[in-house]
Swiss-Prot record:
Transcription factor which regulates nonfermentable carbon utilization. Activator of gluconeogenetic genes. It comes from Chaetomium globosum (strain ATCC 6205 / CBS 148.51 / DSM 1962 / NBRC 6347 / NRRL 1970). Residues 1-12 have a biased composition (Acidic residues). One of its GO terms (cellular component) is nucleus. It is found in: Nucleus. Belongs to the ERT1/acuK family. This is Transcription activator of gluconeogenesis CHGG_09150.
C-alpha cells in the first residue's frame, strides 16, 4: 500500500515540475523583452490580488495534478502535453446523498442536447429573414450567447391563398350543438390576399439563451464585486434571463388589435352580394373585448360563476348527450358578455338576398357590455379591493351595545351559577378595556373599525383555502367570518351566522334538569332575541350576528370566557386548546311554533328551482357523517383559538379552528 502511494507522489511531483517548466518557456517565448522585471508575487491575503477563474469541471490530467482546467475539450494543458485524445472529463467525488445517482445526472454544465454550433431550423412554410453564422465561443468573453434565429410571421409580400375553405383547419368539422349552415365554393375566395400583420419578430420557440451552453456560467466574479461567489453567480444568471426580456415583442393585445384591424372581410368574400360582416358589430367592440384583462374580464374568465359554486365543469345530462361539458350551458345564470342582440349562426346563410336580423347596433351597446363585464370582475360576494373598506366605513362599531346584548343573552340562556362565572371573567378585563378606549377619539374608533374590516379581507382569503372548520369573531363574541367547512359541520348557514337571516335555532344546549323550571323562559328566548335586532342604533343597524355563546353548550362557554380573561391582555402570543360541544342548528317544526325542537333536526327543504344550484345539486348532504358524532344535538369537538390585536393593542378578534 505504501509503495503505490509513493509511486503516485513521485508522478505528481514530476507532473508539477513539467508544468512549471512549460509555464517558464511560455513566458520567455511570449515576452519580447527578456530583461523585464520578474513576475510580481502577490500576498495571498491581499483582497485586491488577481484571482484565478474557477472552473466548474476538469479533465483527468488536470484533476490529478490539481490544476485549473478549462471548459473546452481538449483543454489547453492537454494540447501542450499532446494528450488531446485522452482529454476527458474527470469523475468528481460524489457526496453521500448522491451515491445512488447515475454519473449522467451529475453533469449540470453540458447537457445531452448541447450543440456548440447550432443551425437554424428550416421550415417549409416560413422563410428565415436573417441567416445566422456559425457561433464561436471565446474563452475571455463573458455572457456569450448563441444568436437566436428570427422568423417573420408572414413574408413581406402578400401571399395569395389558394382556397380559404381548404386552408381552414375546421372547414369540414361541425359542432354538435351549433345549428348547421350551408357553404358553397366561390372562385372569388381564391383571389383573396392576407396583408402583412406585423413586422418580423423573434421566434417564441427558443429561449433567449441556451441552458446547456457552458459559456453562460463564465461570469466575471471579480467585476461583480460580491462577497460570495454564489451570490455573484445567481446575479449573473438573473442577468442572462433579463437580457432576453428586454427584446420582448409587443403584447398579445396589441397584436390582436393590429390583426383585427388589418384583416377585412368585404362583400365579395362570401360571394352573395350582401355585406353581412360590416354592420353586425361595431368595429371597436372586438378591440374593447380583446383589451380587457385576461385574468379578470377576459372572454374565458368564467365570469358567470358568481353564485358561490365551485369553478368546475358540469357533467353532461347523460351518456347519450352530445352536449359538451360547459359551465355556460348548465349554469342557471346567463353569461354576461353583452351580446343580447347578436345574430345567431343561422342568420349567416349564403343564399343570395338574405340579410342579418340586426344590420346596425346602437352605440351604447359596446359600453353596456364592458360595464357588465366590469361588474362581474369582483371575485366573490365580498369585494377584494381595500379601498372599498376605507370608503364605506364611516362610523365606529357599537361595542357597548353589543356587550349589552351579550349580557342579556347570557342572563336568559344560562343558569345563575354559569352566569356568575362568565360575569366574573368579563369583569376582570373590563377595566383594561375602559382604560384603553378612554383617550380614543371618534376618528380613532373609525380607524379601528377600518383596520378590523381590512384584516377580515386577509382572513377571509385564508379561510377559503383552509380545510379545517374555522370562524373568526369580534371581541364581543359576534361571528365576523366563517368558512363553509364550519357550516357543513354544525348545520348553521353562513347567512344566519352573519345575521343576514333570522336565527330560528331551538337547540339551546341546556340539560333537561336545568331547564325544567324555566321552560317558558327558554321558549321565549328566540323571539326576544329577535326583537333585539331592531333595537340597535348607530353603526349596528340591521340584523344581529350570532354570538359564540349560542354555538357552544353551557360548560364550554364558561371555559371559553375564563380563557378569554387570561389571553385578552396578559398573553398576546398565547393560544388555548380545549374540548367543547358544538350545538347543531335545529329549526322549529312547521306545525308547532312554540319553539320545540324537531325530531329529525334537518333544515326545511327549499324549492330546487329557486336555488342557486338549479336542478344539478339541491342540497349538500352532510347529515350522514355528522349524525354519528352528535349526541342530543351536540358535537364532541376540540378547538384551538388565539386573539389578534389591533393597532391600539386591544383584542380585535379571535380566530377559532375546530377539529372533530
Amino acid at each position: 500500500m505504501s509503495d503505490s502511494e509513493n509511486e503516485y507522489d513521485e508522478t505528481d511531483q514530476l507532473v508539477k515540475e513539467e508544468d512549471e517548466k512549460m509555464s517558464d518557456q511560455r513566458l520567455t517565448s511570449e515576452g519580447a523583452d527578456t530583461s523585464a522585471e520578474p513576475k510580481k508575487k502577490y500576498d495571498p491575503k491581499d483582497p485586491l490580488r488577481p484571482r484565478r477563474k474557477k472552473a466548474r469541471r476538469a479533465c483527468f490530467a488536470c484533476q490529478r495534478a490539481h490544476l485549473t482546467c478549462g471548459d473546452e475539450r481538449p483543454c489547453q494543458r492537454c494540447i501542450k502535453r499532446n494528450l488531446m485524445e485522452s482529454c476527458q472529463d474527470g469523475v468528481r467525488k460524489k457526496a453521500k446523498y448522491l451515491h445512488d445517482a447515475p454519473p449522467e445526472a451529475l453533469r449540470p454544465v453540458l447537457g445531452p442536447n448541447y450543440n456548440p454550433n447550432p443551425t437554424p431550423r428550416q421550415n417549409g412554410h416560413r422563410h428565415p429573414s436573417i441567416q445566422t453564422s456559425e457561433a464561436s465561443s471565446n474563452q475571455g468573453t463573458f455572457f456569450s450567447q448563441s444568436p437566436a434565429t428570427q422568423f417573420p410571421l408572414f413574408s413581406a409580400a402578400q401571399t395569395p391563398i389558394g382556397n380559404l375553405a381548404e386552408t381552414l383547419p375546421f372547414a369540414n368539422q361541425q359542432s354538435p350543438t351549433s345549428p348547421s349552415f350551408q357553404t358553397s365554393g366561390n372562385p372569388q375566395i381564391s383571389g383573396m390576399t392576407v396583408p402583412q400583420v406585423s413586422s418580423p419578430m423573434t421566434n417564441f420557440g427558443t429561449l433567449p439563451f441556451d441552458p446547456s451552453d457552458p459559456n453562460i456560467y463564465n461570469f466575471n466574479l471579480e467585476g461583480l464585486n460580491f462577497g460570495s461567489q454564489y451570490g455573484a453567480m445567481e446575479f449573473g444568471m438573473l442577468g442572462h434571463m433579463s437580457s432576453g426580456a428586454a427584446e420582448t415583442p409587443p403584447g398579445d393585445a396589441t397584436m390582436a388589435r393590429s390583426a383585427s384591424g388589418s384583416l377585412g372581410f368585404g362583400p365579395g368574400v362570401f360571394g352573395n352580394g350582401v355585406n353581412q360582416f360590416d354592420n353586425v358589430y361595431e368595429g371597436n367592440i372586438l378591440d374593447g373585448f380583446l383589451g380587457l384583462d385576461a385574468n379578470h374580464n377576459g372572454l374565458y374568465s368564467q365570469g358567470n360563476l358568481q353564485h358561490g359554486l365551485p369553478h368546475a365543469y358540469a357533467i353532461a345530462a347523460g351518456p347519450t348527450s352530445i352536449q359538451s361539458p360547459s359551465t355556460d350551458t348548465n349554469s342557471p345564470q346567463p353569461t354576461p358578455l353583452g351580446f343580447e342582440g347578436s345574430p345567431t349562426m343561422a342568420t349567416f346563410s349564403t343564399t343570395p338576398g338574405s340579410k342579418p336580423a340586426n344590420q346596425q347596433r346602437p352605440s351604447t351597446r359596446q359600453s353596456n357590455a364592458i360595464a357588465k363585464l366590469g361588474q362581474q370582475s369582483v371575485l366573490g360576494k365580498r369585494q377584494r379591493d381595500p379601498s372599498f373598506v376605507y370608503d364605506t366605513v364611516k362610523e365606529p362599531f357599537g361595542y357597548v351595545s353589543s356587550f349589552h346584548k351579550l349580557f342579556i343573552l347570557i342572563q336568559k340562556r344560562f343558569t345563575a351559577a354559569h352566569t356568575s362565572r362568565i360575569a366574573k371573567s368579563l369583569a376582570s378585563i373590563r377595566p383594561s378595556l375602559m382604560a384603553s378606549t378612554k383617550n380614543l377619539t371618534k376618528q380613532d374608533l373609525v380607524f379601528m373599525e377600518k383596520y378590523f374590516q381590512r384584516s377580515l379581507l386577509e382572513y377571509e382569503e385564508f379561510m377559503h383555502q383552509c380545510s379545517s372548520p374555522t370562524l373568526a369573531c369580534r371581541r364581543t363574541g359576534e361571528v365576523a367570518i366563517v368558512n363553509k367547512e364550519f357550516c357543513a359541520l354544525t348545520g348553521w348557514t353562513k347567512d344566519v351566522l352573519l345575521g343576514k337571516e333570522p336565527n330560528l335555532n331551538v337547540n339551546l344546549g341546556g340539560s333537561a334538569s336545568a331547564n325544567t323550571n324555566s321552560k317558558a323562559r327558554v321558549g321565549l328566548a328566540t323571539p326576544r332575541l329577535k326583537s333585539l335586532n331592531t333595537e340597535s342604533g348607530g353603526s349596528t343597524d340591521g340584523p344581529r350576528p350570532v354570538y359564540l355563546a349560542e354555538l357552544l353548550d353551557h360548560e364550554s362557554v364558561v371555559e371559553f370566557y375564563e380563557d378569554y380573561s387570561q389571553l385578552a391582555f396578559n398573553d398576546s402570543r398565547g393560544h388555548k386548546t380545549r374540548k367543547c360541544r358544538l350545538l347543531k342548528y335545529r329549526a322549529p317544526d312547521k306545525d308547532d311554533g312554540t319553539g320545540e325542537s324537531s325530531t329529525d333536526g334537518q333544515l326545511p327543504q327549499k324549492d330546487p328551482r329557486n336555488s342557486i344550484l338549479s336542478n344539478r345539486v339541491a342540497k349538500i348532504d352532510g347529515e350522514h357523517g355528522i349524525s354519528k358524532l352528535e349526541r342530543d344535538g351536540k358535537l364532541e369537538c376540540s378547538y384551538t383559538w388565539t386573539i389578534k390585536r389591533d393597532v391600539f393593542d386591544m383584542p380585535m378578534l379571535f380566530v377559532i379552528n375546530v377539529s372533530t
